[in-house]
Every structure is written in structure tokens, then in C-alpha cells.
Design a protein with these regions (language model features):
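Extended substrate-binding grooves/exosites of carbohydrate-active enzymes
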Residues: 9-306
Length: 306
């Protein structure tokens, strides 16, 4: 309540929760004092045929399905989440990695956020932090996804600038980003400046990169990208990358993946065997419109197979 003298001027109500989070080098992520591995998924904000408009019942349905299969975390790929999602995760017990940007000041696409980054990045990031820093389900901030800046010498300064904003507005949570150029980022300090080094794909690089990281912690910020079509089985059953068929489907045996990705067990092995791996966020929790890999130009393919 805000008073001017004895006169009530404003009332603000905010939900909150009490829990502890800690990341210990070489040992992992601890939630309420217990070592916890992220068994997460990346999820776009759209709700399939319902579209991108927020639907509380549909959001909660997705969370129930994810929890039923053993998922304990969602990465909001690749944008700031709706308040309805965060509230539902608070109530239903799902951890959140809240992501902010898919692009900084180097373009992924001609008419992208790069045109607005210099003016709006701090304002937009502060808005995210202020909106959700009281929500217990949010356990980590993510400041970027596969940004082209990761290749540039010196752009680790931008990463540190964004991370410092997160620390300034919320000193209680670690900060990460999803990086898909593991060799570049460990050699140009792009990964070293982060609280948590998040790697997209290439789990076979974890052991190599761990030795070069001062944090001594590795996160699979985006993993797998295995493709499959429900009820479709291809023979012979063999592992394939970017396999294409006349029916524009993929085998439901989960043995097919993209050129840059791998099968789920490739990631599972790393996170089960390596104590410094704190878990992963599989691509993707639910199918979405767009990216019909490997059928990019094959009409009428328009939905993802991940």
C-alpha cells in the first residue's frame, strides 16, 4: 500500500515463493539444498492450432503433459514469456529459464531486433526482470539464443553488459545464454563471462570445453533436435541425419536427427555421467508451425517434426 499522509494512493499485490537455488562448481545445480538436474524442454509461445494468443487452459494442459513425462523445466524459446505461463508454473511446480533475446545487434534476419537492440535492449531486459523476479518458478535468466555476436572478438563485452543488468536488477539468479559455436565461444571469452555456460547441441564437446571454462559447469541449453512423426515407422531401422522421404515424414523410432544435432541418448549419457553437467533443455516440448526440417522447401510441409 502506498499512502500520502493518511490517504491511500495505490495498492499493489505480487505473488512470491520461498526457495533457494545455488550452483556449485563441479557439483551442479541445487534447489532447496538438493542437487537437481534440469530435465527441461525448449518451448515456443504458440499453442499449435490455437495460435499465439494466450490461452490459460491450453498452457496448463501443456505443463501437465510435460510433468507427466518427467519434465521439470521450460526454457521460453526465444522470447520473454507471458505472465500466464509463469503464474501457471509457479502454481504447478515447473522451473523456468526465462529467455529474452534471439538476436542482439548483429542481424539474423534483415528486419530483426538488431535494428532496435541498441535503444531497447536494456529497457526490454529490465522489463522482463521486473515482471518475474518475484516468481519462484524462474530459476535462471537467459540473455540470448545463438546470437551471431558469439563469433566476434570483443562482443563478450555485450554479454557481460546484459548479464550485469540481470545482476543489478536481480542478484539472486544465475544468467546463461544458448551458444551453438562451442569452439569459438571458449576461445574468445564469450562463454567465460557467463554465470553458466549454455551450449546448444554438440554434447561431445562438453568434456573438452569444461576444461577451458572457469565456471566448471556445463548446461545443455538446447539439445537433441531428433525428428519423428507419430505412428510412422521407416525400415531398415538405422541412424540417419537429414533423412528425407516422399511422404515428408520421419521415423517414429527416434533414430533420425538434423545435420547439427543428435539423438536424445547422446545427451542423456553426458548429463548422467558428468557431475558438472547440470541438465538439458530438449528441442522441443511441443511441435510448432515453421521449421519443417528437413523438408524446408517441400510443399506442403509447414510444421516442425522435432
Amino acid at each position: 500500500r502506498l499512502y500520502e499522509g493518511d490517504k491511500l494512493k495505490d495498492i499493489y499485490t505480487t505473488p512470491f515463493g520461498i526457495r533457494s537455488i545455488e550452483i556449485i562448481p563441479d557439483k551442479g545445480f541445487f534447489l532447496n539444498g538438493k542437487r537437481t538436474v534440469f530435465k527441461g524442454v525448449c518451448n515456443h509461445h504458440d499453442l499449435g492450432p490455437l495460435g499465439a494468443a494466450v490461452n490459460d487452459a491450453a498452457i496448463r494442459r501443456q505443463i501437465r503433459i510435460l510433468k507427466d513425462m518427467g519434465c521439470n523445466a521450460i526454457r521460453t524459446s526465444h522470447n520473454m514469456p507471458a505472465p500466464e505461463l509463469i503464474r501457471a508454473c509457479d502454481e504447478m511446480g515447473m522451473m523456468i529459464m526465462a529467455e529474452s533475446f534471439d538476436e542482439w545487434n548483429v542481424a539474423k534476419c534483415k528486419n530483426g531486433y538488431n535494428l532496435l537492440f541498441d535503444e531497447w535492449a536494456e529497457k526490454d531486459l529490465v522489463n522482463l526482470l521486473h515482471n518475474f523476479r518475484n516468481n519462484p518458478s524462474v530459476v535462471m535468466w537467459c540473455i540470448g539464443n545463438e546470437v551471431p555476436n558469439q563469433w566476434n572478438e570483443g562482443d563478450c563485452k555485450i554479454a557481460k553488459w546484459l548479464q550485469d543488468i540481470c545482476h543489478r536488477e536481480d542478484p539472486t539468479r544465475p544468467v546463461t545464454q544458448g551458444m551453438d559455436a562451442p569452439d569459438a565461444v571458449v576461445n574468445n571469452n564469450f562463454a567465460a563471462v557467463m554465470d553458466v555456460a549454455g551450449f546448444n547441441y554438440r554434447p561431445f564437446k562438453y568434456k573438452i570445453n569444461y576444461k577451458k571454462l572457469p565456471q566448471r559447469i556445463v548446461l545443455g541449453s538446447e539439445t537433441a533436435s531428433t525428428v519423428s512423426s507419430r505412428g510412422v515407422y521407416k525400415f531398415p531401422v538405422e541412424r540417419k541425419a537429414m533423412a528425407k522421404y516422399d511422404d515428408h515424414q520421419a521415423s517414429s523410432y527416434d533414430v533420425e536427427h538434423c545435420g547439427w544435432s543428435n539423438l536424445p541418448e547422446d545427451d542423456f549419457i553426458q548429463h548422467e555421467d558428468l557431475p558438472y553437467c547440470i541438465g538439458e533443455f530438449v528441442w522441443t516440448g511441443f511441435d510448432y508451425l515453421g521449421e519443417p526440417t528437413p523438408y524446408y522447401t517441400d510443399w506442403p510441409s509447414h510444421s516442425s517434426l522435432f
